[in-house]
C-alpha cells in the first residue's frame, strides 16, 4: 500500500471537551504519524473559504458559525492508505450512524458538531493541507 497524507480537524466541541491528547493517542495507536499540527481559531473568512464547496446549502451558515465558535486543531497524518483509514477511525459523518469505538461515536454532539473532520480523497487532503500549512510546516518523519 502507498504511504499517503491526510488532513484532520479536531473541531471546537471536541477541543472544548479536552480530548485532544486522547484523539492524538488514537491516531498514533492506529499507526498514523502526526507530521504537522497546530491550534487556531478560525475567522469567518477562513471558515467560509475552507467550506466554500458547501456555500448555498442550508447548513452552511450554521457550519461557519460552529467552526468559528472556538479553537480547532488541524493536523496532517501520514500512513499507509491514510485517507480511508482515517475516515474509518472517524466514523460516519452523522454520529447517530457512527460505529461504537469511532471518534464520532465517542466525541460528537450532533450532525454539525460531530467532533472531527477528515479528508475524503487524496486530492482533497492535498488541498486542505495547503489551506492551513505553509511550505516547511509539515515535517517528514523518517525515524
From Swiss-Prot:
One of its GO terms (biological process) is UTP biosynthetic process. SUPFAM superfamilies: Nucleoside diphosphate kinase, NDK. Transmembrane segments: none annotated. It is found in: Cytoplasm. Its cofactor is Mg(2+). Coiled coil: none annotated. GO terms for cellular component: cytoplasm. Homotetramer. Belongs to the NDK family. Major role in the synthesis of nucleoside triphosphates other than ATP. The ATP gamma phosphate is transferred to the NDP beta phosphate via a ping-pong mechanism, using a phosphorylated active-site intermediate. This is Nucleoside diphosphate kinase. It comes from Klebsiella pneumoniae subsp. pneumoniae (strain ATCC 700721 / MGH 78578).
Amino acid at each position: 500500500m502507498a504511504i499517503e497524507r491526510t488532513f484532520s480537524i479536531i473541531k471546537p466541541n471536541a477541543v472544548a471537551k479536552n480530548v485532544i491528547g486522547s484523539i492524538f493517542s488514537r491516531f498514533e495507536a492506529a499507526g498514523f504519524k502526526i507530521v504537522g499540527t497546530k491550534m487556531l481559531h478560525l475567522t469567518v473568512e477562513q471558515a467560509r473559504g475552507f467550506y466554500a464547496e458547501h456555500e448555498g446549502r442550508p447548513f452552511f451558515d450554521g457550519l461557519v458559525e460552529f467552526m468559528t465558535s472556538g479553537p480547532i486543531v488541524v493536523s496532517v497524518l501520514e500512513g499507509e492508505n491514510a485517507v480511508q483509514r482515517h475516515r474509518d477511525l472517524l466514523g460516519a459523518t452523522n454520529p447517530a450512524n457512527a460505529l461504537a469505538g469511532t471518534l464520532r461515536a465517542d466525541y460528537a454532539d450532533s450532525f454539525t458538531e460531530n467532533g472531527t473532520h477528515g479528508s475524503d480523497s487524496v486530492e482533497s487532503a492535498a488541498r486542505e493541507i495547503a489551506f492551513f500549512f505553509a511550505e516547511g510546516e509539515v515535517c517528514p518523519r523518517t525515524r
